[in-house]
């Protein structure tokens, strides 16, 4: 599991810390890149602004995407991810506290691979993150990197 990058897109520092703690507690030792808003997430993925020197042929194995964020919300980020040849096959899991059915429907309509509501209880949250890591980083077969790196 350990050389696959996870992109965590989360604006809430408490939720970021909980997610990172839950990943470590679940023995997910992958590198986690944190983007604190939607614009930063896209900058990372496409190697723009502060990420202009990043090797964009190296894409995350998994993106954990919050929905309610400043600058650009998660649904708009997802729209951009799916519209670009380099990232359209990138596994994206929406990890949000939103209980709005319209977010769920729109997330899947825009191409989310999964939609997980963050449990309030840390033990349940840790368990959810453990299952998430096991499935997406161990069991799931991701698209070939060659397909995602093409532009």
What residue ranges belong to the model's regions?
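C-terminal output helix
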Residues: 40, 120-133, 141-146
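Hydrophobic residue at a beta-alpha junction
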Residues: 71-72, 81
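Receiver (REC) domain active-site loop signature in two-component systems and cognate sites
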Residues: 67-69
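Acidic, metal-coordinating helix/loop segments flanking the phosphotransfer/catalytic sites
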Residues: 18, 24, 33-62
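Short, glycine/charged-rich "phosphate-handling" switch motifs in NTP-dependent
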Residues: 113
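Conserved acidic segment of CheY-like receiver
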Residues: 4-14, 19-24, 63
């Amino acid at each position: 599991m350990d050389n696959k990058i996870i992109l965590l897109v989360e604006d809430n520092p408490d939720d970021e810390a909980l997610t990172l703690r839950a990943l470590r507690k679940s023995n997910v030792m992958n590198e986690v890149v944190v983007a604190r808003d939607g614009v930063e997430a896209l900058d990372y993925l496409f190697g723009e602004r502060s990420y202009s020197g990043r090797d964009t042929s190296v894409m995350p194995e998994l993106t954990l995407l919050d929905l309610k964020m400043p600058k650009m919300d998660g649904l708009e980020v997802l729209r951009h991810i799916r519209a670009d040849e380099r990232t359209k096959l990138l596994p994206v899991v929406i990890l949000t506290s939103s209980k709005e059915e319209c977010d769920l429907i729109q997330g899947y309509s825009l191409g989310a691979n999964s939609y997980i509501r963050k449990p309030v209880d840390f033990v349940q949250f840790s368990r959810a993150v453990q299952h998430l890591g096991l499935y997406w980083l161990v069991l799931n077969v991701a698209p070939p990197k060659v397909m995602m790196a093409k532009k």
